[in-house]
Structures are given as C-alpha cells and as structure tokens.
UniProtKB/Swiss-Prot annotation:
Residues where Mg(2+) 1 binds: 371, 375
Location of the motif DDXXD motif: 371-375
Organism: Cannabis sativa (Hemp)
Principal subcellular localisation of the protein: plastid
Residues involved in Mg(2+) 2 binding: 371, 375
Positions contributing to Mg(2+) 3 binding: 518, 522, 526
Protein's name in the database: (Z)-beta-ocimene synthase TPS13PK, chloroplastic
Subunit structure: Monomer.
Disordered: region residues: 50-69
Locations listed in the record: Plastid, Chloroplast
UniProt feature, compositional bias: Polar residues: 60-69
Amino acid sequence: MAALVSTVSSIIRWNSNNNNNNNFTRSVKSCLSSNYHNNNNIIHNKTVLMSTNNNNNNNQKNSSRRSANYQPPLWQFDYVQSLSSPFKDEAYVKRVEKLKEEVRVMVKRAREEEKPLSQLELIDVLQRLGISYHFEDEINDILKHIYNNNNVYNTNNNVYANSLEFRLLRQHGYPVSQEIFSTCKDERGNFMVCTNDIKGMLSLYEASFYLVENEDGILEETREKTKKYLEEYIIMIMEKQQSLLDQNNNNYDYDYDYELVSHALELPLHWRMLRLESRWFIDVYEKRLDMNPTLLTLAKLDFNIVQSIYQDDLKHVFSWWESTDMGKKLEFARDRTMVNFLWTVGVAFEPHFKSFRRMITKVNALITVIDDIYDVYGTLDELELFTNAVERWDISAMDGLPEYMKTCFLALYNFINDLPFDVLKGEEGLHIIKFLQKSWADLCKSYLREARWYYNGYTPSFEEYIENAWISISGPVILSHLYFFVVNPNKENALLSTCFDGYPTIIRHSSMILRLKDDMGTSTDELKRGDVPKSIQCKMYEDGISEEEARQRIKLLISETWKLINKDYINLDDDDDGGDDYSPMFYKSNNINKAFIEMCLNLGRMAHCIYQYGDGHGIQDRQTKDHVLSLLIHPIPLTQ
C-alpha cells in the first residue's frame, strides 16, 4: 500500500512548465498496481481479441441508435416560472444590512481582543454558516495577523487549536507548515491526543485533508488513527441512544459533537459543496448551547434572500432552454436544466455571480445534450461530421449534418458568438471566442475518441483512458468559460496565452476529480446501456482485480488528486519571509486570480456532491431532489 501511495500521484502529475500531453502520457506509465507490467502482454492480446470479435458488429452498431431511456425532467417550466419568494421585500434586505453591521462590529472586536483561538472559531462559524463572504476583508486581516505572529502556534498541547489554525490558514492559501503541531507531539513524534478529546480529534481529522503532494509529516498517518477513534465514538453514542430507546426513554441530550463527527466521516469538510454545507450547518448550529442569535438570524435571512436570487436565475435559464427547442426536438437527450443550474450554485453561490450562474447553466445544458449525442444517439459517421463542424466553427458546416445535429450545433454556435460583450469586450473578445471554440472542439474530439473505442469494441489501458477522460468529462470547457467571466480578459491573459498549448494544472486536477467521481457514480448504468469502459473497468481489466478493489484504488487516486489541487493554491515553497505585507500566493499572482482558483476547487466539491450516492445528474435520485428543494425551493423558517 505504501508503494501504491508513492506512485499513484504520478498518474495525475503534469509538468506546469510544459503542457505537452506527451509528458502526461509518459507520466502515467507508473500505474496503480504492481501487476501492470506483468499483465501487459496479456492486456494487449485481450484487446486485439476483443477488437477482432467485435469488428463484425461494427456496421450494425454504426447504423443503430441506442436509447438510455432517461426519465423526463422532474422540474417543469410552468412550475419554475411560478416560484416566488417573500424575501425579495426591501424590509428583509434592510434587516440583513443592519445585522451585517452588528456582525462586522463583532469581528472587529474579536480582532482587537487579541484572542487568536476565539478569532479562528468565529471565522469557522462564519464560513460554515455561509456568511463569511460579507466579511472577507476583516477575515483576511485576522488570518494575516495570526500567520505573521504565530499566535496559536505557541499554544502548548492543544490539538484542537493548532488543527483549526492549520486548516483555516491553508484554506486561505497561507503556507503554514506541519511544524505547527510540534507542541502536540511526544518525544517519538506521535500526536498526544486524548481519545476523550473528540473536539481535538475531529479538528485534526479535518485538517489532514489540506496536505499537498509529496508533503512529509505525520498528519496523514494520524488521519487513519483519528478516523478509527471517531468511528468508535459514533458507535458508542448510537449504542447509548439505542439503550435509552429500549427503556422507552427519549430524553437523551442533543449531542452537537456527534452531529459534526458523523457528518465529517461521511465526507470531509474540505470536499463538501459550500452552500449545501451551510444549509446543513444552520440547522445544527441552531441547537448549539452557545449559539449566537445574531449570527444565526443573519445566516437564515441571507440564505433566503440569496435563494430568491437563484429563483430569478432559474426562470431565466428555463426560458432560454425553452427557446432553443432542444428539449422538444432532441427527446433522446437528458433535459436536466434544474440540475445543470444546481452545479453552478455549487461552483459560485454568492449573489454577485448571478450572470455567471446563468451562463454556465447554459454551458452545462449544451454539454449534457452533446454528451448524449455522442454516448447514446449518434452513429459514428454522424459523430465524425459533428466533430468536424465544431472544429471548423463555420455556419456552413451545418449543411452536412442531420437535422437533430443542426439544432444542437446552431444552439452552441449562437451561444458562443453571442456571449455578453460586457464580458468579452475590447480586442480580446475575438481571441477569447476562438479559445472557447477550441475548448468545445477539444471536448468533441475526446467524445469522438471514446465513440470509436465503443464501436471498435476496444478497451483502453488505464493510462490511455485517463489521458482522454479528464477532457471528455467537460471540466476544461466549464472552467475555460468561467475564467473569462471572473477576470478581466484584457489584463489577465494567463489562460489565453496558453490556450493552444494546454490548460493550467488546476483545470486538469479539478477535471480529474470530476472524471473519477463521475465514473464512481455512473459507470454501472452507462455500461448497461452500452458505453466505453470507464476508469473502474479499465483497472479491473488491466490488473485482474475485483470491482471493489478497483473502486478502492480510484478512491485513493481521488485523494491524491486533492493533494495536487491543494498544491495549486498553497505554495509551501514560498520564500516570502512574512511581515505585515505578506499575502497568500493567489492574492499576489498576476496570472490566475483567487475567485477562479476557488471555483476550480468548488467544481471538484460539486462532483462529490452529485455523485456521492450514484448518478445524481442523469438519474435524478432522491438526494439530488432533496438538494434542489433545500437550496433552491424551500426557504429556511425564521424563528418568531
């Protein structure tokens, strides 16, 4: 297992100084299993055999159309247009402004009192309640002061305090070292954690998910031990509750720590969708004994007001979808406008990203339809024509397409060329459109490659699959669009300058998380209807292992990819010696700004949210429906 951990990251490590995909291909040579080289000859023989056996069926496949039998959308146009919210009322807006000023005074007072632990705890609560975006300047001022003065660092043997500092500083891009835990270790270097210190163990567990690639230290080893203790704590509490129920005694006390621990063991805080986490935490925080009523009221009101903005966004994107006629003319494709919008809330929930959410919902809708054309409906000959049309980006390229493809191509063509000129303004506009068109061409070419694999009955090696799959998952298309929406394209040309050479590593890493989580949640259903083998099946076939073992290796790969994402925004090699002017690397960068980096992280988090229990995008499972209801439809009841 240790050897596996040391080699797994090579599969997803790209050279940031050279975006040539050949480097990526070579880096994948070190695979997840030691069986790879032993099975290599067998693998190639099996592949050829499979190709030979399926060649006779190619013509039949090429002329037939598959059907995924997707369910109709749960959320209809008329229902969405009927949504209304009382929280648009100016009285609520004024009340929120008043509460914000009260909280701002609270934060400033905490800064002046010079109690670092209290400051960190306040920041943590503000973040988890979903209202920290109102106080970014004040929070950054506190964290900068704590980092430059090592305030909590000197707290002797306080695992909780040091873990909280480590997590919050790294979350905000500060290159804090694991040496912060030196006061919490014994002479052998082991953490001195009391098994009864649930708060400390939970804080340590959550902090361990902010490690970066190749970072030495005891924190990751401690994660498994801490997880074991936390699991034992959960069992103990459950047994205690069951014992009381057996005695017909329902008067057991609410356990705040139990709620946090069980939640963290399901999925760590660092990997959770921010807005959904806030909705959950508001309910949990309300039951806390030391709950602050001002913070709670602000969180509830702010959530409901922002939800009313989401409902306006929904009306807009549902109207756009109706205007394209794709839902009516392309009945084979998934009509998932609501879920497509839910993705955008996960990537950027703040109200001022309203235009972004509307744009990316349209991108998501187009991706979903085009994906179904390649995966389900189109013949190989038709897919070749469509790919060529997108590459040419010429309206005359529509002439050779079948009618259903013309509908989709025209919607895509008009969308890209009609992007708001307040975004693509100046002379850069034309170049940006060219880059966005290229990202769509890259996506279609990756789809076509997978279609060829399917029609030829070919099972790719794991490295061959991954080399193509991080693009075919559509992450680069989504992140390319949002990049030019959140930065000034006339000033920040980092992505544009490399658009014909590759993508920044953070786009690749975020897309990798999206790909692997998608495969974990959808591969079984996709294979049933007929699709190319996904990462799980490629590992099973290549290494001769069970599906369960392959899934465990993919989970490990996801964890290693998160370390690469962490490294993209936490610069542990930063030689800045601190001082009053120190800021995290993404504040100083002239290349990629903070908002874009956070959105890349959030796309990975959304992948965990949508695919945690299966295919939450395509199948419309209960969890996704509950997410829609709690985030977009139902306001939080206010305490009278």
